[in-house]
Amino acid sequence: MTDAMFSSSAKPHFIKPMLPGFETYIVIPKAFYSNYLEGRQEGNAAELRSDATEITWKIKIDGRRMTKGWEEFAVAHNLQVDDILVFRHEGNLLFHVTPFGLSFCEILYSQRDEKDVKDTTGKVTRSRTVKKNGKNECSSVDTDFVVPVTASNQRVDSFYLPRGFTTSSGSSKLCNEIILIDEKDRPSTLKLRYNKSSNRFCVSRGWRAFCCRNGYRTGCFLRIILVRKGKTPVLRIFPLERDEDNIEKHSKKVKQEVEHEESVKEETNVESGKLKRDRLLQKDPKNLCSTSQDTNFVVPVTASNQRHDSFHLPKGLTTSSGLSKLCKKIIFMDQKGRSSILDLSYSISDDRFTVRRGWKAFCCRNEHKTGCFLRLILVQNGKTPVLRIFPLERYENSIAKNSKKIKQEVEYESAKEEKNLESLSLSDNSSFVVSVTVSNLSEDILHLPIRLSRSNLLDKKIHEIVLMNKEGRTWILSLKYSKYSGRFRITRGWKSFCEANGQKPGCTFLLKLHLSMTRFDQDGVAWDKK
């Protein structure tokens, strides 16, 4: 039954926004023209019909233009700038035209015999009326309406259904879910909530992901058909043909209109999110986790974890934070207090958690691009952990924006390191210079000189190294050897060590390796590190 209802409405469409100068002619979109009309319209006239009248209007087609006869059609339907027309192709050169207002509700026409006005040419015009009350507005499009994909509804991940949908669709105001079916018959379940003040339903939590999945970009218009009522309504969605020449101009104005209404809602959500967060931190301090290395860590936004829509949490988070291995969901809270629920899974073989299904959308929503580094803080433990996320503070100008820049910086620091070694004239392979840089802090990795590997002073099977400062405090860090580069690198702890000792980018250490101890000097001060 669903397919039958859809197939009856899924005829070729294209839309035309009425821009200044539309009165004399309109241009058929190039894509629609080449697919359905090219080579068939020569010497013929298109026929236009509408629900406003039983008249069939004959319009001359000159290439892609509808010219002679179009002005009469526009005057008879009292078309105005910013109106939107949906042309449904009925076959041959016959089109059914449906006018929509700026709010994307169908314009209703009423015949007023006593007010019909005849102009000097003897043509009769009709008075256009758009009903304002909530019960009648959009009455003819309550179950078949058009929704624009705008920058604002993508940013807030939601859009509003027409007011008439509330009553005529038979949907209960208690409905909390709705199913969207795309062109490939793939269903997506989204959040549905009723706004009492505006008497409208709002679709949220999944709208942006749905558009991204189907390639619907800002400026697209989607025809939405209600194909099933009930506790969980079902909507069928397919795109209308776009006018590549004019729709971009019109979408900017649409964006401004819709953005004004939704910006107020967004600001309200931000404030309420901050209040909820503050109450959470004050109400139950026992559940707050410490800002140790394992509950306060850095995650890079990479092309790989964006492509796979997932990333791994540090292994230490499994034990030190007491995170339950049975957790299935995790909440990310961004800088504005907005929450996103993502899937969480635990791998026994790796002994670590993986966040998936929503990571890519979260980054897109907050404009975290590839090359960014995010600080994640575990602020609440329990059945559904809560992580606060914000971009890592940048030293100097900014953190490296992509892996190429990081690589260049590492190579530069390596060259600088070699120069420092030459100036120090250290012939002993057990002594070498290391520098604190933006890149090795961001990556939490310190690459040791290659000559340390060649000197065979360190066993390549060693996996840990102990650093000891002048006060005798020690840090156990991971040590790995790369066969590919032939170098040792210190990982998982280098950044914490530097922060604990107040070392920032630009500091330089003279490292001295002893039998079971590594000794560092900084500005003449001895630092012993095992």
Curated annotation (Swiss-Prot):
Keywords (A to Z) from UniProt: DNA-binding, Nucleus, Repeat, Transcription, Transcription regulation
Name assigned to this protein: B3 domain-containing protein REM-like 3
Places the protein is found: Nucleus
Gene3D superfamilies, per the entry: DNA-binding pseudobarrel domain
Any one GO molecular function term: DNA binding
PANTHER family (UniProt xref): B3 DOMAIN-CONTAINING PROTEIN REM-LIKE 3-RELATED (PTHR31674), B3 DOMAIN-CONTAINING PROTEIN REM14-RELATED (PTHR31674:SF62)
Residue ranges, annotated region (Disordered): 251-276
GO cellular component, one term: nucleus
Positions of the DNA-binding region: 11-103, 144-241, 296-393, 431-530
Biological source species: Arabidopsis thaliana (Mouse-ear cress)
